[in-house]
Amino acid sequence: MSSYSQLFAQHLDTLQHRTRDILQQQGLSGLAIHSGQTHRIFLHDQDYPFKVNPHFKAWLPVLDNPHCWLLVDGVSKPVLLFYRPVDFWHKVAELPNAFWVDFFDIRFLTRPEQIADHLPASKQEWAYLGGHLEVAELLGLGQPNPEAVLNYLHYHRAYKTPYELECLREANRIGVRGHIAAKDSFMAGASEFEINLAYMKAVGQGANDAPYGNIVAINRNAAILHYTHLSALRVSDAERYSFLIDAGVDFHGYASDITRTWAWRRGEFADLIATLDSQQQEIIEEIKPGRRYSELHLQMHHKLARLLQSVELVDMSVDEMIHTGVTNVFFPHGLGHFLGLQVHDAGGFMQDERGTHLSAPEQFPYLRCTRVMEVGQVFTIEPGLYFIDSLLEPLRQSEQGKRVNWNKVEALRPFGGIRIEDNIVLHANGVENMTRQAGL
């Protein structure tokens, strides 16, 4: 057995244990996990790109095949119902032949409705996990997406198995190749569209494979947090200021989520990037088991406030900037989030396996994680500094606006903003920065 297969075997043991535990707690017999179905575009004869149920791909890296099922009870060998229709219009999924096949009892479906022949007699005692409740009802599965089951699975998903960590490392290694290619393309004068093509070629994945839409932003577009327009217009060297790329890849169903910002030429903006990069590394060093993620976010706002002071953008004390929300204008999003099967992975607000919810602090409503940081968790650390028109204008009209250096703000607006994002594993003996270790 290869070392990779050994990691996968341990991973399945963990999933089986979690399944046994929650089934016993809830008095259920098993889980019927649906890979999903395609969705037809309204008034069209084509479907939206298929996205697999994350609960399905937690068990195996089958990412592009709808109408598949897993039947798991935490004890027996998991049953995989693999969909292989007779179809001359579309590519049919290949016969499974990978490191994971020996761990499943694999059966084949040629029509979606054949799943009914494979369900247990006690299907009323089985929970359905998936996005098509009408299918669960039609099949007679008695427990569709039970909240207690989902809460338990989402909470424990924060603790990554060694197999999952290796998948995330590989997603970072591949993603870093793309980021280097994207930087080189920007420096060669390419458009956003061309840069994105260079990124996709380097990672070997298209838009439908990506864990999220690539953010490839030149100049002011970097001030749009989720900018995915991809302009095909080239910007002249004289009007070329900055480049922000936030892009990841998928490896066996696990996402990387990496951001870098580059300056076209030396100057104040390049210095800001270097300073924020140093602060990002400092805040990563503060990650310790037992600390709450929201405390780390607040600490980052203190660092950003000192940066705003040091470059004479804002003439206020650190505490006053934070208390009045001035730092939120320049850094409006959260410091980061859990990362794994989904780019914003589940469980970020859950304080226990029952799903007890702790919302983001009122002062920082866009923070995506309030958990206590523990060994085995993976999250992003992504501080930012932006010049966003819709946030700056209310500040200009406020009392605090009198203490902002608006001449400097206007000089920096054309650069859009900065974000620097790494993917971090928390170990008992420290942190592992998967992104930096991959060479970025």
Swiss-Prot record:
<keyword id="KW-0464">Manganese</keyword>
<feature type="binding site">
    <location>
        <position position="257"/>
    </location>
    <ligand>
        <name>Mn(2+) 1</name>
    </ligand>
</feature>
<dbReference type="InterPro" id="IPR052433">
    <property type="entry name" value="X-Pro_dipept-like"/>
</dbReference>
<keyword id="KW-0645">Protease</keyword>
<dbReference type="GO" id="GO:0046872">
    <property type="term" value="F:metal ion binding"/>
</dbReference>
<dbReference type="Pfam" id="PF00557">
    <property type="entry name" value="Peptidase_M24"/>
</dbReference>
<feature type="binding site">
    <location>
        <position position="257"/>
    </location>
    <ligand>
        <name>Mn(2+) 2</name>
    </ligand>
</feature>
<feature type="binding site">
    <location>
        <position position="337"/>
    </location>
    <ligand>
        <name>Mn(2+) 1</name>
    </ligand>
</feature>
<dbReference type="InterPro" id="IPR001131">
    <property type="entry name" value="Peptidase_M24B_aminopep-P_CS"/>
</dbReference>
<feature type="binding site">
    <location>
        <position position="382"/>
    </location>
    <ligand>
        <name>Mn(2+) 1</name>
    </ligand>
</feature>
<dbReference type="InterPro" id="IPR022846">
    <property type="entry name" value="X_Pro_dipept"/>
</dbReference>
<dbReference type="GO" id="GO:0005829">
    <property type="term" value="C:cytosol"/>
</dbReference>
<keyword id="KW-0378">Hydrolase</keyword>
<dbReference type="InterPro" id="IPR048819">
    <property type="entry name" value="PepQ_N"/>
</dbReference>
<feature type="binding site">
    <location>
        <position position="421"/>
    </location>
    <ligand>
        <name>Mn(2+) 1</name>
    </ligand>
</feature>
<keyword id="KW-0224">Dipeptidase</keyword>
<dbReference type="InterPro" id="IPR036005">
    <property type="entry name" value="Creatinase/aminopeptidase-like"/>
</dbReference>
<keyword id="KW-0479">Metal-binding</keyword>
<dbReference type="GO" id="GO:0008235">
    <property type="term" value="F:metalloexopeptidase activity"/>
</dbReference>
<protein>
    <recommendedName>
        <fullName>Xaa-Pro dipeptidase</fullName>
        <ecNumber>3.4.13.9</ecNumber>
    </recommendedName>
</protein>
<dbReference type="GO" id="GO:0016795">
    <property type="term" value="F:phosphoric triester hydrolase activity"/>
</dbReference>
<comment type="similarity">
    <text>Belongs to the peptidase M24B family. Bacterial-type prolidase subfamily.</text>
</comment>
<dbReference type="InterPro" id="IPR029149">
    <property type="entry name" value="Creatin/AminoP/Spt16_N"/>
</dbReference>
<feature type="binding site">
    <location>
        <position position="246"/>
    </location>
    <ligand>
        <name>Mn(2+) 2</name>
    </ligand>
</feature>
<dbReference type="GO" id="GO:0004177">
    <property type="term" value="F:aminopeptidase activity"/>
</dbReference>
<dbReference type="GO" id="GO:0006508">
    <property type="term" value="P:proteolysis"/>
</dbReference>
<feature type="binding site">
    <location>
        <position position="421"/>
    </location>
    <ligand>
        <name>Mn(2+) 2</name>
    </ligand>
</feature>
<dbReference type="InterPro" id="IPR000994">
    <property type="entry name" value="Pept_M24"/>
</dbReference>
<dbReference type="Pfam" id="PF21216">
    <property type="entry name" value="PepQ_N"/>
</dbReference>
<dbReference type="GO" id="GO:0102009">
    <property type="term" value="F:proline dipeptidase activity"/>
</dbReference>
<keyword id="KW-0482">Metalloprotease</keyword>
<comment type="function">
    <text>Splits dipeptides with a prolyl residue in the C-terminal position.</text>
</comment>
